[in-house]
A protein has these predicted regions:
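Membrane-interface amphipathic segments in extracytoplasmic regions
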Residues: 1-256
Length: 256
């Protein structure tokens, strides 16, 4: 989350909705100095991702910041719930199961989806750190039946987001999304890519890596992972997503 007292402006970071791309340049105007951009311990909530605190928890534990969201112009980015659920599964496998992108198979995705669904169906008071990316998007827009966030953009309209942020703050946001799931298109070289990934990440700055990756995508050497093939429509997971995230589907559709 970004809050700018100077601009009376706020960005609510919904997990897995291009938030890193939008938030990165806005750090320059963040009055909280990155307080809501970290993983850490909270006295009441335990170990949490401060970037992804829902509006309910914000109102309870950070009433001052919650009041600013009401008073300032707040915006958020939303995403198709099916795409977002898959993206969250990929991140969970990479971040908490230490799997490389190229090691994530359809069977592994299906197994992980079943585990996540069991956890969500247990209806915890709040989602723990390992499941925070599966929070409903609506929990970052509404609180106690009231819409708190003024402006909602779909991830498909990055050009409009760029123009909106520039108009409100004078800050330039790149249209190219960060944290995309990409892979080399040629399976024969993927073992070599896996071998070199860690030293490459350690030696080459992120900005340069991102630039090179975009060039490789343009050249057809790298491409977005075909996540749609991992969990086909009409199955058990699809049914769960459509039920659990019903309000999110409506929220995304209304933003298009």
């Amino acid at each position: 989350m970004i809050i700018s007292d100077h601009h009376r402006f706020a960005f609510v970071h919904i997990p897995k909705c291009a938030g890193v791309s939008v938030k990165h340049p806005l750090r320059a105007i963040d009055t909280t100095a990155g307080y809501f951009d970290r993983i850490g311990e909270h006295d009441a909530m335990g170990r949490i991702h401060f970037a992804h605190i829902t509006l309910r928890d914000l109102a309870e534990h950070f009433p001052g910041e919650a009041a600013k969201l009401r008073d300032y112009r707040a915006f958020a980015v939303v995403r198709d719930p099916n795409q977002r659920f898959l993206s969250a599964l990929f991140q969970r496998l990479r971040e908490f199961k230490q799997l490389n992108q190229s090691d994530i198979t359809r069977n592994r995705i299906e197994q992980e989806a079943a585990d996540v669904i069991r956890y969500l169906e247990s209806d915890p008071v709040r989602l723990d750190l390992e499941h925070v990316h599966f929070n409903r998007q609506s929990d970052y827009v509404f609180h106690a039946g009231e819409r708190i966030v003024d402006d909602i953009f779909p991830i498909e309209r990055m050009a409009d987001i760029v123009a909106y942020v520039a108009d409100r703050t004078g800050i330039s946001v790149e249209e190219e999304r960060r944290n995309r799931s990409t892979e080399v298109r040629f399976a024969v070289v993927r073992p070599l890519v896996r071998l070199l990934r860690r030293p490459y990440a350690a030696l080459v700055p992120y900005a340069l890596r991102n630039h090179l990756r975009n060039r490789l995508v343009s050249a057809g050497i790298y491409g977005d992972v075909n996540k749609g093939a991992m969990l086909p429509a009409g199955g058990y997971v699809d049914g769960f997503v459509r039920s659990y995230y019903k309000q999110d589907f409506a929220l995304h559709a209304a933003s298009l």
